[in-house]
Structures are given as C-alpha cells and as structure tokens.
Amino acid sequence: MTHRLPDHITRRLRLPLIAAPMLNVSGVDLVVAACRNGVIGAFPTANARSTDELDQWLTDIQARLFAAPEEAAPCCPNLIMRSPRMADDLACLVRHKVELVITSVGSPAAAVPALHGIGCLVLADVATLAHARKAIAAGADGLVLLSAGAGGQTGWLNGMAFVRA
C-alpha cells in the first residue's frame, strides 16, 4: 500500500482534501470547481445514468480541466463495485486514463489490476478494520475511512480506531 500520494498529484493540491462523492449531488460542475480550486473532485459513477453518460462526463471534465489556467487537481470517480454496470464503468475509466479512483460497496480486487495497469491509484472505502485489511490485501493504494459521523454510507467506528490499528 502506498504511504503517501505521489508528487504528480500532491503538487496540484492546495489542500489535502477530497470533495466527497455525493450520490445524486456530485456532478461535472462540482467536480470541475473542486479540481480547479486545488482539491480532488470525486463523484459516484452512478450519478451518470449510463456508461455512455459517464464517458461524456469524463470527456467534459477532462476538457474543462485541461482548459483551466492553472494545473488542476485530479478528478476521482467513485466506482461502485456491486453495480451491474461495474465492468462497463471500469472499462470507461481505463479508457479515460483516470489518475485516482475510489472503490466502494465491495472489495476493490476486481478493479485493481486494470486501474494499476494505467497507473491509477485505487482508494478503497472501508467501514471496519476487517474491510481495511481485505482492501489492502486486494492491492488498494489507500483507504477512505467511513467512520461514525461521516455522510452517506457511514461506518460505526470512531476514526481514531483505524489510526490505532
């Protein structure tokens, strides 16, 4: 597991922050605004209603970030592992050569080889220490700790429990 984000990502950040991938909220405009302001802009792939729409979103995001006056922070699709679209969405992310992906709702194992094959870092949502250990064993580069008080799919652990482990 990676111990820190690589320089080609951190040098583009103003804050070490991910704008959360919020279901039915995070879209192209929010992601672009976050990235242009130096934070990682994340969005659930499910917010695009089809893989074709996801392809359009990524094309639009990448074009708008490339046109930005300063080098923008990366976008970070949130790939839902138990989605019926997972394989098609994963192929779309690979075609677009995304730099970061958050996997959620299941093990990242099915996505890690393809994403690592394009040099993409894989962050895995985890709600328990057991999930964290499984994600690390599956090849995740980092963890997104779903702790008590987090929005959306929350865990029940205090965030410090992960730190102690």
Map each language-model feature to its residues.
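Active-site entrance/lid segments in N-terminal catalytic domains of soluble metabolic enzymes
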Residues: 1-165
